Structures are given as structure tokens and as C-alpha cells.
Design a protein with these regions (language model features):
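N-terminal "domain-start" segment that seeds a small globular fold
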Residues: 8-50
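Signature tryptophan residues that serve as conserved aromatic anchors
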Residues: 41, 62-65, 69, 79, ...
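Short active-site neighborhood of thiol/selenol oxidoreductases, capturing the structured segment around
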Residues: 46-70, 76, 90-91
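Active-site acidic short loop of glycosyltransferases
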Residues: 53-55, 85, 116-117, 134
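Structural recognition of the beta-strand scaffold that forms the well-ordered cores
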Residues: 57-60, 89-93, 119-122, 142
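Structural microenvironment flanking redox-active thiols in thiol-disulfide oxidoreductases
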Residues: 70-114, 122-129
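Thiol/disulfide oxidoreductase modules built on the thioredoxin-like
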Residues: 112-118, 122-165
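PEST-like low-complexity, intrinsically disordered acidic/proline/serine-rich tracts
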Residues: 172-192
Length: 192
């Protein structure tokens, strides 16, 4: 076979919401699934729901040969850096589209070459993908400190809205020093 996983497709651009989200505009999309079933973890030991409770979590489903994923990566990396000390945990979930993306050494090289320092779950069995009922790369799920999904975004774009969601969830979690500014990423093509 081609090595393709379950009904997957890359998501393109997305609609933007005018203005930043307020408390009432962030729905409760249900309890986030545990990040169980990864075949390997890079940059971290396996993360459990218990370890993540009390933290705001951004789960980023990606694969290293997806151009849309690579274009969102500078934003995800910048958020991970900017908000780490305020309680944000970014977890990359690498779900392969092609057979060569299942090879751990290829994923390790991509993570190193792309400068990804946050935890990456290698989801070669699509267990995390299926638990989230995910269908797209890239896909971002924003999880509050109580472990509930409060926002999701598929594809490129929506960066200001996504960052406002992170800020709001950190404030809800009790972080007092949330920087209200937005990151300025000069993403020119693929970051290498």
C-alpha cells in the first residue's frame, strides 16, 4: 500500500473571526483524549493526561512532508517559546501520510532540522489521530487547564485568532502575566 493512514487530507486556508474571542465565544468541545498510543516520543518522555492537567495545551497534528504544516510551524514554535513560562505546553503529534514518514530516523532528523524543541508524539499507528477524530494536517486543538478542548483550527491561517485563544486560556488558568501582543512571524516559504 501507499502507507497512507485513514481518510486524511491536507487542509488549506481558513476563515478568520473578526476580533479576539471572548469567554463566551470559546465553546466546550468536550474532554481532550489522552495522548496514549504513540509509537515513540521525541524531546520528552510520554506525556499523560495527569501530567498535563492544569496546563494549557496546544496539540498540533502534523507530518514533516506537508507544506501546510511546515508553513504553520514558525507560529507553533513561536507560541511554544513565548508562552512556555506562562503554562502553555505544545505537543506535536506526527501522524505520517506516506510510508517514508513512518521511519523514526526520518522524523528525528526532521524534528532536529526544523528546530522543534517541544515534545513530539510519533503516532505511526494513528491512535492519537483517531482518538481526536482528526482528519486534517495541520490541525491544532487548544485544550484548557481542565483538559477540555475549547477551540480547534484546521489548515493554515487564523494565527491571530489562535494566539488570542492561547492568551485567553492562559488567563482562565490563572496566569497573571499573559503578554497581549501577537507574535510577528516572517514566514518565507519553508523554514529549514
Amino acid at each position: 500500500g501507499s502507507g497512507a493512514g485513514p481518510a486524511m487530507m491536507a487542509a488549506g486556508g481558513a476563515m478568520r473571526m473578526a476580533g479576539g474571542p471572548s469567554r463566551s465565544t470559546l465553546p466546550d468541545e468536550g474532554l481532550a483524549p489522552a495522548l496514549d498510543g504513540a509509537t515513540d516520543w521525541l524531546n520528552s518522555t510520554p506525556l499523560t493526561a495527569e501530567q498535563l492537567r492544569g496546563k494549557v495545551v496546544l496539540v498540533d497534528f502534523w507530518t514533516y512532508s506537508c507544506i501546510n504544516c511546515l508553513r504553520t510551524l514558525p507560529y507553533v514554535k513561536a507560541w511554544a517559546e513565548k508562552y512556555r513560562d506562562q503554562g502553555l505546553v505544545v505537543v506535536g503529534v506526527h501522524a505520517p501520510e506516506f510510508a517514508f514518514e513512518r521511519k523514526l530516523s526520518n522524523v528525528e532528523k526532521a524534528v532536529k532540522d526544523l528546530g522543534i524543541s517541544y515534545p513530539v508524539a510519533v503516532d505511526n499507528g494513528y491512535k492519537i489521530w483517531r482518538a481526536f477524530h482528526n482528519q486534517y494536517w495541520p490541525a491544532h486543538y487548544f485544550i484548557d487547564a481542565q483538559g477540555r478542548i475549547r477551540h480547534h483550527h484546521f489548515g493554515e491561517g487564523g494565527y491571530a485568532e489562535s494566539e488570542r485563544v492561547i492568551q485567553q486560556l492562559l488567563q482562565e488558568a490563572g496566569s497573571k502575566q499573559v503578554d497581549q501582543g501577537l507574535i510577528d512571524v516572517q514566514a518565507q516559504g519553508v523554514q529549514q
